Amino acid sequence: MRLTLQHITRLKVLLHLAGFLPLLWLILSVDQGWFSADPAKDIQHFTGRMALKLLLATLLVTPLARYGKQPLLIRCRRLLGLWCFFWATLHLVSYALLELGLDHLALLGKELISRPYLTLGVISWLILLALAVTSPQIMMRKLGSQWQKLHNFVYLVAILAPIHYLWSVKTLSPQPILYALAALILLLFRYKKFRQWWR
């Protein structure tokens, strides 16, 4: 069955709910004390995993649209990318406020040097920031051919973000490995484009 614009509109509503409802759960979990004895870590991990899931979902759209012969699915990609940026921003803010605290934000630079996995995370966030700012149609028209070159940097985020996660947990636990494998598989779908981008 070929998806119609009406189907895509309904799908977008569901995707918005998928991006928003976990935020309500997070707020409720904090309010009700459902997290472990280290809620700051739990919040950081939850927001980080949400950002990573949405990044993978964003990368999944193109293969689904191409191989599933559903070109209208591409219209969902920007929505997922913006939700990914939203959760990545929550992840960064939760680290800055809960780990460092308002009184110690000046230590962030020192933290980035002493903990390289943080550097990877911040680089990923800066790329996502650039992609979010330039995602509207008006920016696409202004940037012209440079727009696609800029947005190809999402592939770099797909490499850096799983490494950031693996490195931050400091153990070879299954979950970050699965995220890394999923990112690798999605990048393999773009092997030719990815190779051209690095030339």
Curated annotation (Swiss-Prot):
For biological process, the GO terms are: protein repair
Protein's membrane topology: Multi-pass membrane protein
GO function term, MF aspect, one: FMN binding
Could you tell me what the cofactor note in this record states?
Answer: Binds 1 FMN per subunit.
> Looking at the keywords, is Thylakoid present?
no
Indicate the transmembrane segments per the record. Answer: 13-33, 79-99, 120-140, 147-167, 169-189
Keyword presence, DNA repair: no
Q: Which UniProt keywords apply?
A: Cell inner membrane, Cell membrane, Electron transport, Flavoprotein, FMN, Heme, Iron, Membrane, Metal-binding, Transmembrane, Transmembrane helix, Transport
Gene Ontology CC terms, in alphabetical order: plasma membrane
A Pfam family of this chain:
Ferric_reduct
UniProt superkingdom: Bacteria
InterPro entries linked:
Fe3_Rdtase_TM_dom, MsrQ-like
Cofactors, names only:
FMN; heme b
Family membership? Belongs to the MsrQ family.
Q: How does it assemble?
A: Heterodimer of a catalytic subunit (MsrP) and a heme-binding subunit (MsrQ).
Q: Which NCBIfam families match?
A: PRK05419.1-4
Q: What does this protein do?
A: Part of the MsrPQ system that repairs oxidized periplasmic proteins containing methionine sulfoxide residues (Met-O), using respiratory chain electrons. Thus protects these proteins from oxidative-stress damage caused by reactive species of oxygen and chlorine generated by the host defense mechanisms. MsrPQ is essential for the maintenance of envelope integrity under bleach stress, rescuing a wide series of structurally unrelated periplasmic proteins from methionine oxidation.
Name this polypeptide is given = Protein-methionine-sulfoxide reductase heme-binding subunit MsrQ
- Name of the gene encoding the protein in the UniProt record: msrQ
